[in-house]
Amino acid sequence: MRLRTALRSTASALAALALLSACGSGTGASSASGDAPLVGVDYPRSDTDFWNSYITYTPGYAGQLGLSLKTTNSQNDVAKLTANAQTFISQGVKGIAMAPQDTAAVAPTLAQLEAKKIPVVTIDTRPDSGKVFMVVRADNRAYGEKACQFLGTKLKGEGKVVMLEGGLDSINGRDRTEAFNDCMKRSYPGIKVFGEATNWDGAVAAQKLQTDLTANPDIKGVYMQSSFALAGTLQVLKQKGLLADPSDEKHVFVVSNDGIPEELKSIAAGKIDATVSQPADLYAKYALHYLKAAIDGKTFQPGKTDHDSTIIQVRPGLLEDQLSAPLVTLDGGTYGGVPSVKSDDPSLWGNNHG
């Protein structure tokens, strides 16, 4: 989930404290045991609530799994990711978890780590090429499908919607965009989709949404491919007089992806209508779980797991554990055959964080 700008909330403050106390930007360790295997985790960015939540979860899970931890932050820069990998190598880590935002440019770094027999687990993104021990992410095509089915149901198969696309140079942006478009063409051909490239930039998303609403005031739906666009979307709708209660005919139905606390609050308040909860907590947990498994010499095969997910083979030699990511709505209803959970459900990580 490549993102640039997003909400700053309590989770951000907690993440900053966690970085200072537990991480130290590449020099900190969350476990001091000399017997604990040393692993490196590169955080992809710290400018969004989702990734700041992931950052706060990581040290705790490392401790639970008996791992000693070194961390870096590549700040959405593949050159920094490459440099951080070199730092980890010099520190003698036994495995590395990373979330490469440029899924093509990371290939040389993966090749170097493979040559040094350092296993890699990628989180949220799947490299376009190169070898990793496991990819830990949710089914991002399902994100686009679920958003489509929700909006298609709410609009009764007719009308106009704006899709604020993520970066199409990332597998996540491509998966969500293609799946949403495919679903609309297949299931709701009466809905016109305005696809807007934003490169995960909230300011760009807000500007393009404003332009679309000015030219097409009858737009009744917005699909934000992540919470990077939440603040800007709400601001634009408010300026246009469209931030109305769901029962009001002026209401514009909004679906997001991430499941951050602010999204859940916005659903409860009637400001947005749905999100897909991307599991920040489970990303942290299973990234480290698979690193420890790699260090211990374990192997895996495609199939169901013991944690309500499915491992698939995406290409020869590359496995992906697709974690559960539910549709979240106010009423917990079923939309276009897609079940949802209520926004106040205590099982959602966004209701137990911050």
Please describe what each predicted stretch is.
Residues 225-237, 267-268, 274, 278-299:
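Extracellular/periplasmic ligand-binding modules, especially the Venus flytrap/periplasmic-binding
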Residues 68, 104-142, 150, 160, ...:
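Flexible loop/hinge segments that line or gate small-molecule binding clefts
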Residues 56-71, 186-190:
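Signal peptide-proximal N-terminal region
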Residues 35, 172, 183, 187, ...:
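Hinge/cleft segment of the Venus flytrap/periplasmic-binding protein
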Residues 88-95, 118, 216-220:
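Short acidic/histidine-rich motifs immediately flanking catalytic phosphotransfer sites
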Residues 135-221, 239-253, 269-270, 294, ...:
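Bacterial carbohydrate/catabolite-sensing allosteric modules
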Residues 1-38, 111-118, 348-354:
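Short, low-complexity disordered leader/linker segments with a strong preference
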Residues 42-55, 70-80, 101-102, 125, ...:
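Hinge/beta->alpha junction and helix N-cap segments in small-molecule ligand-binding domains
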